[in-house]
Amino acid sequence: MSLKSRKISGKEYYLLNNEFYTGKVEITYEETGDLKTVGYFYEGLKMGEWYYFYEDGATERIENYLYGELSGIYMSFYKNGKLKEIGQMKNDKMDDMWYIYYENGNKQYENFYYLGKQSNGIWREYHENGSLKMECPTMSGYLYGECKEYDEKGYLIRKCFMRDSRKNGYEIEYNRSGKEISRTNYVSGVEMKD
């Protein structure tokens, strides 16, 4: 079976013999014949769950489609089978909470999205050992508010105020005993000299 694709009104449609294709599709790796992709089309559009596999047969990712657009749970995996990324999609855009993991299984990032943009909430990044690395409030897609950065042992090492994802105000660095070791002033992301 040889499907052809065609963009119509911004959506990717798949046709077989110039007709919108409805049915299951299985794509294999040419070299081995092992399964690469399994999914379903409805009237030329991707529909429902689609599975993608590594050459060794392990699941690479699972995507959900609604009339040709990513919509619903999205998951991707490392070759070792551990979860790499999970989140919601809506209208082909990230929507709701998203989590990204290190290959060892510890969380790397978490963030809240609304239709593809960082939404209001807290953006968090973690060290590979699982300890919190950085947290920043977000507003309307921008880092906005007091951001804090920690070392792998959990000690606060830096904090600064962000406005529109740019440093604005003092950035303060600390040693492990919590004593201030430097202070730098920023205005709209530009360091101000004393």
Give the ranges of each region predicted by the language model.
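Glycine/tyrosine- and acidic-biased, solvent-exposed loop/turn segments at the edges of beta-strands
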Residues: M1-D194
